[in-house]
C-alpha cells in the first residue's frame, strides 16, 4: 500500500474515529476521496447504527448547564468508558447539552428533536455518532428545571462528568444553592427532606434503635431526648437536609441554608448508569474473537 493511502487511512480514522476495517472500506469505495469517504461512512452507518440499537449502553457521561433561573441535566450513554473519554464524544455531548438548554426542551422526546445544526437533530447526531464511533450512543434522560418566583437554582457538574446535581432553594443566592448541589453530588443521600421518607421506611429506621443500658429506668423525657438524638444521627445518613454539610461539617445542610436565609425546596442528582445493568466483558476474549 502506498504511503499516500496510509496517510489517508490515518487521517480518516482521526477525523471519524471509525474502525480500521470500516475506514479502508470507505476509502476503497470512494477511490480514496476522503470527503466522499466520510459521507460514505455516514450513509452506511445508518445501517450499522440500527444493528447496534439492541446493544446495551451503560457507560457514558452526565452533563449539566445552568443559570440561577434555569438548569439542565442530561445523560448520554456509550457502551464503554473508553469511548466516554473520547474527544469527539465529549464534543457531541457539549453540543447536545447547549442545544437542548437553549431550546428549552423539557422531555426526552422534545430533546431528541432539537436541532444541533441547520440540518441535524439530536437524534440524528446520535445515530451518526453510533455509526462513526462504532458503539451505541444514546441520550438516556434529561431533567429541565426552572426556578419558581422567589427561588434560585444551583447546578453542579463533577469534574469526572459522571455525577451532576441541581438544587432549588428559596431566596436569591445561587452560590449557596450550588454549594448544596455539590454536597448532593458527593454524598448521594436517599431522601431530600425528612417529609419525603415513606412511613414504612421511617418505621424501619426507628426499629434499628438499640436502647442503651438502663434506658427503661430513665424518665420519659430523657428517653425521648436520647431517641430523638439517635434518630437525628440516622437521618443524617439518608436525608440531605439533615446531613453534616461537607464544606462546614459543624452545620447541617438545613442550618447552612438557614444561615443564608434560604430553605431547601427540591434537589435532583444524576449519576452515569443508575439503574442500568452493566455487561462485564473479557477484553482478551473480545480481541481474540475479532481475529478469528
UniProtKB/Swiss-Prot annotation:
CDD domains: UBA_EF-Ts. Keywords: Cytoplasm, Elongation factor, Protein biosynthesis. One of its GO terms (cellular component) is cytoplasm. Residues 80-83 are annotated as: Involved in Mg(2+) ion dislocation from EF-Tu. The keyword Iron does not apply. Pfam families: EF_TS. One of its GO terms (molecular function) is translation elongation factor activity. Belongs to the EF-Ts family. PANTHER family: ELONGATION FACTOR TS, ELONGATION FACTOR TS, MITOCHONDRIAL. This is Elongation factor Ts. The lineage of its organism: Bacteria, Bacillati, Mycoplasmatota, Mycoplasmoidales, Metamycoplasmataceae. The gene is tsf.
Amino acid at each position: 500500500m502506498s504511503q499516500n493511502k496510509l496517510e489517508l487511512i490515518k487521517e480518516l480514522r482521526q477525523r471519524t474515529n471509525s474502525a480500521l476495517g470500516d475506514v479502508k472500506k470507505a476509502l476503497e469505495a470512494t477511490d480514496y476521496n476522503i470527503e466522499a469517504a466520510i459521507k460514505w461512512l455516514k450513509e452506511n452507518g445508518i445501517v450499522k447504527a440500527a444493528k447496534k440499537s439492541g446493544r446495551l449502553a451503560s457507560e457514558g457521561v452526565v452533563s449539566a448547564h445552568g443559570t440561577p433561573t434555569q438548569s439542565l441535566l442530561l445523560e448520554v450513554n456509550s457502551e464503554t468508558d473508553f469511548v466516554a473519554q473520547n474527544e469527539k464524544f465529549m464534543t457531541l455531548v457539549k453540543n447536545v447539552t447547549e442545544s437542548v438548554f437553549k431550546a428549552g426542551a423539557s422531555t426526552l422526546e422534545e430533546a431528541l428533536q432539537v436541532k444541533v445544526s441547520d440540518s441535524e437533530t439530536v437524534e440524528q447526531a446520535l445515530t451518526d455518532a453510533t455509526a462513526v464511533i462504532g458503539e451505541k450512543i444514546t441520550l438516556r434522560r434529561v431533567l429541565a428545571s426552572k426556578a419558581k418566583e422567589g427561588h434560585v437554582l444551583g447546578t453542579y457538574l463533577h469534574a469526572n462528568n459522571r455525577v451532576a446535581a441541581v438544587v432549588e432553594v428559596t431566596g436569591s443566592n445561587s452560590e449557596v444553592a450550588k454549594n448544596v448541589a455539590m454536597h448532593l453530588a458527593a454524598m448521594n443521600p436517599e431522601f431530600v427532606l425528612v417529609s419525603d421518607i415513606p412511613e414504612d421506611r421511617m418505621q424501619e429506621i426507628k426499629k434499628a434503635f438499640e436502647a442503651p443500658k438502663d434506658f427503661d429506668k430513665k424518665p420519659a423525657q430523657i428517653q425521648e431526648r436520647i431517641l430523638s438524638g439517635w434518630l437525628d444521627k440516622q437521618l443524617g445518613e439518608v436525608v440531605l437536609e439533615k446531613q453534616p454539610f461537607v464544606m462546614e461539617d459543624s452545620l447541617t445542610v438545613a442550618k447552612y441554608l438557614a444561615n443564608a436565609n434560604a430553605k431547601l425546596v427540591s434537589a435532583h442528582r444524576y449519576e452515569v448508569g443508575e439503574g442500568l445493568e452493566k455487561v462485564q466483558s473479557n477484553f482478551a476474549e473480545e480481541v481474540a474473537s475479532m481475529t478469528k
